[in-house]
Amino acid sequence: MQLFHLCLIIFCSCPTVQASKLCLGWL
């Protein structure tokens, strides 16, 4: 759950291709 929260924070802060890639990497 915490990882998902971090992902959301990152996505909201910087919704870019790199952010989505980082999110996918975490998940």
UniProtKB/Swiss-Prot annotation:
Database matches in Pfam families: Hep_core_N
InterPro entries for the chain: Hepatitis_B_virus_capsid_N (IPR013195)
Any one GO MF annotation of this record: structural molecule activity
Further information: This virus has been isolated from a low asymptomatic carrier of HBV. A genomic mutation in 1896 creates a stop codon at position 28 of HBeAg, without affecting capsid open reading frame. The HBeAg negative variants of HBV are associated with fulminant hepatitis, but can also be found in patients with persistent infection and chronic hepatitis.
Name listed for the protein in its UniProt record: Truncated HBeAg protein
